[in-house]
Amino acid sequence: MIPGEIMPKEGDITLNEGAEAITLMVANTGDRPVQVGSHYHFAEANAALEFDRDAARGMRLDITAGTAVRFEPGQRRDVQLIPISGARRIFGFNQQVMGDL
């Protein structure tokens, strides 16, 4: 083994396998771009984003960890959301939950 060497497992890796996804239409009603990261509690995203926040409660974007989705001003797009897993406790963000979901 070489220090820093990556030895990937054979075959394909399926991200978020088994997670029940929902699709929401999101519109950026603001005058600036908005970017939302992979593990951000989507319901608490920037107020300029217009979407069903109740449906997004406890959900995050169904994208690769460490990536983000950018919404340009006036842009509308569908996004897939999956449930936040683990202990399902939310702290920080816009402080709308601050505990168990």
Curated annotation (Swiss-Prot):
Q: Gene3D superfamilies, from UniProt?
A: Urease, beta subunit
The record lists the organism as Roseobacter denitrificans (strain ATCC 33942 / OCh 114) (Erythrobacter sp. (strain OCh 114))
**Subunit composition and interactions:** Heterotrimer of UreA (gamma), UreB (beta) and UreC (alpha) subunits. Three heterotrimers associate to form the active enzyme.
Biological processes annotated in GO: urea catabolic process
Single GO term (MF):
urease activity
Q: Which InterPro entries match?
A: Urease_beta-like, Urease_betasu_sf, Urease_subunit
Compartments it resides in:
Cytoplasm
Q: Which family does it belong to?
A: Belongs to the urease beta subunit family.
Q: In which pathway does it act?
A: Nitrogen metabolism; urea degradation; CO(2) and NH(3) from urea (urease route): step 1/1
What GO cellular-component annotations does this UniProt entry give? urease complex
Q: Which SUPFAM superfamilies does the annotation name?
A: Urease, beta-subunit
Q: What is this protein called?
A: Urease subunit beta
Q: Which taxonomic lineage is given here?
A: Bacteria, Pseudomonadati, Pseudomonadota, Alphaproteobacteria, Rhodobacterales
Q: Which reaction does it catalyse?
A: urea + 2 H2O + H(+) = hydrogencarbonate + 2 NH4(+)
Report the EC number(s), separated by commas if there are several. Answer: 3.5.1.5
**PANTHER family on file:** UREASE
For this UniProt record, give its keywords in alphabetical order, as a comma-separated list.
Cytoplasm, Hydrolase
Its predominant location is cytoplasm
